[in-house]
Amino acid sequence: MGSDEVLVKEQQKMQKLLHDLKVSASRVRSSQLAPLVEIVTEFGTCLTTLVELMLSSKVEQVVLSVQQAASLTELETALGRVTRLGLEGNHLCRLVARHGGVRLLVEMLTSTKWLPARGSLLRTLGTVCCVLEAIRQLEEVRGVEVIARLVGDSGAREPERAEAAGVLAQMNDLTIRYESFV
């Protein structure tokens, strides 16, 4: 089922729940609050699902804007959007990873076309790779090796090497914290 279909289904469910809530509230007595609480709880679940779908859709659009960038200016603008999403919290970083953002950033990092944007690409990766899902995706696409090679590349500019080292340090710190937590 596509996200539009799920969105419509959730919207219809919320409309029905609101109707049920109105009917129940008009008939409720203090001793019969359980049905009302059940409806409100289900409404909250629907609302959470709708918000998640809407956020996911917006994040997907932002990741797509990175992929479709035709110029360095467009790419820098799109990377700024992804970075701002990442700074909003871990949940949005997970959504960026879910929509292939980490994979895309690593692909662009290895492209000679986007060589002038390597620092920004690394900074964006560092922002997004603050959650386990993003780190796993980074490992799956061999991004760790790509970034490690940049750290050791004497031909790379110093700011790029510093950004690359920062991504690796953050990723290792998060991995160690996660493993010690488990």
Can you describe what each PLM-predicted range is?
Residues 1-182:
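Long amphipathic alpha-helical tracts in eukaryotic proteins
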